[in-house]
Amino acid sequence: HIRAVDAPGIAHVKLIDATPIGINVRSTVATYAGVHDELRKLFARTPEAKERGYKNGDFSYNTGRLRCPGCDGTGVVSLDVQFLPDVTIPCPDCRGSRYGRQAGEVKLVNKAGQAASLPELMDMDVTAALDFCQDRKTVRQKLETLKQLGLGYLTLGEETPNLSGGEAQRLKLASEIGRSQTDTVFVFDEPSIGLHPLDVQVLLGVFQA
């Protein structure tokens, strides 16, 4: 087995495979792709947020004060069923959105005059969110990458442990695109697994870009 290879100019080797992205239900498409952080910044700058004293961190469903108190920001609750395994259901308070009522009262307005709260955006698929955020450069670029990789149908709030192997692999690739990779070699393990031929063409286009 080769333990080390001398390759001038190469400092990193990254494996992009189809293994699941963790088991944490708090990890979503938006958080893994870096979209959620950018959205929180945008919502913290809205007039409603400033008026109420909300900061960037308040819009986190993990630790922020706008997270749902019923499920603590997980979007689900467990029911104790005697003599049977616990049953997990969507939180009845937030209906799976992970956020409390106050979060729904803070709206982001785009140039077209459309308004949406952060819970509403997290419930959109990538394509719909991209349409809404056309005038928000940092968010738009990240969403465009996801769509270019054929992930436009995934909702931003989709839990990453629920993704298929092919989806997980493309999401990992999306998280790397946009960073400086001049000294990096990527190793892909069956990148076309589970993909429709049209999606394979899209993926090849990304490789060649």
What label would you give each PLM region?
Residues 1-209:
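Conserved phosphate-binding elements of NTP-dependent enzyme cores
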